[in-house]
């Protein structure tokens, strides 16, 4: 009975595409490094950060941090803006809702 009610609720409130997107966001946030990067971006000055600012605190290689940031961008949690040599990251509207 519970699964039937749950299935009806999901059908009424969210499309399969919306559920897949939400699942992808939770999957991305399920990694401690990515969650930490999201929190660091949120706490940074002007609510945006460059990979060059985020790398030193992680203890990871810049390429690894960039990989994690790309996954967060692909999942719709971060925006990426290129400025010259560096990419800057900021939270999307959906990420701001999740972190409230």
Model-derived features: positions:
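Short, charge- and proline-biased low-complexity linear segments
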Residues: 43, 99-100
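Alpha-helical residues within the helix-turn-helix
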Residues: 56, 67, 73-74
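N-terminal leader segment of winged-helix/HTH proteins
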Residues: 1-29, 74-77, 91, 97-99
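Short coil turns linking two alpha-helices in DNA-binding domains
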Residues: 61, 66-68
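N-terminal helix-turn-helix DNA-binding core of bacterial DNA-binding proteins
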Residues: 20, 24-61, 83, 87-94
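Conserved phosphate-binding and hydrolysis motifs of nucleotide-dependent enzymes
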Residues: 68, 76, 84
